[in-house]
Design a protein with these regions (language model features):
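Short, flexible loop segments at boundaries between secondary-structure elements
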Residues: 120-147
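Conserved active-site and cofactor/substrate-binding residues in soluble primary-metabolism enzymes
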Residues: 43, 83, 128-131, 164, ...
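Short, structured patches in soluble enzyme cores that scaffold and shape functional sites
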Residues: 33, 104, 128-130, 155
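Short, catalytically relevant binding-site loops at active-site mouths
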Residues: 107-109, 132-135, 158-161
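Short, structured coil segments at secondary-structure junctions
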Residues: 55, 121-123, 176-177
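Redox cofactor-anchoring modules in respiratory/redox and cofactor-processing assemblies
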Residues: 138-180
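Iron-sulfur-cluster electron-transfer modules
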Residues: 1-119, 136
Length: 180
């Protein structure tokens, strides 16, 4: 991993119930945290799994997730990146994964664009966690605690510019009763 000790990758998840529920379940959807949430913004990783759990999302997590390989690709090490991508894709296919949910914009870009660029079609759908939450909340807004606040939201570059996901984060905040 580019961010730390591979053995510490799951340190963000100390909730034994959530860990037991999602670790290596038989879902064909993988919540792929990525290096940044797993090592650097651990509350983001934990919040993601809590929200998806609360919304009844069907997914699994794995302990030996590894890095998506985006940095190898972006620094021009395409042969090494391709090997990395192939190993990850093999792992996903062996687990029967058909969909990846990722909270990391770097992983999103890598799985959605870099993997197909080097490997062709992967047969795995890739979705940012914001999209997943938005889709789940459209029909479950009653689960949210309403806040009566004005909020300023700054779009994450890759999510807004590459994916054009501008309305989804704002709608989620509006579902919570916020004015954006």
């Amino acid at each position: 991993s580019v961010s730390g000790d591979p053995l510490a990758r799951m340190d963000w998840l100390d909730d034994k119930d959530l860990k037991q529920k999602y670790l290596d379940s038989d879902s064909d959807t993988l919540l792929y945290m990525g290096c940044i949430p797993s090592y650097l913004v651990k509350d983001s990783a934990y919040s993601t799994i809590q929200v998806l759990d609360k919304l009844g999302c069907d997914f699994r997590i794995i302990e030996d997730e590894g890095c998506c390989g985006t940095y190898l690709y972006e620094c021009g090490k395409t042969n090494t990146a391709k090997d990395y991508f192939e190993k990850n894709l093999e792992k996903f296919k062996a687990l029967g994964i058909k969909k990846l949910i990722v909270p990391c914009n770097g992983c999103l870009k890598c799985f959605k664009y870099f993997y197909p660029a080097l490997l062709g079609k992967t047969g795995i759908e890739v979705e940012h966690a914001v999209e997943t939450v938005f889709n789940l909340l459209e029909h479950q807004q009653d689960l949210l605690k309403k806040v009566n606040q004005n909020i300023t939201f700054q779009d994450p570059c890759r999510l807004a510019r590459t994916e054009n996901k501008i309305k989804e984060p704002r709608k989620i905040l509006e579902y919570c009763g916020a004015s954006v």
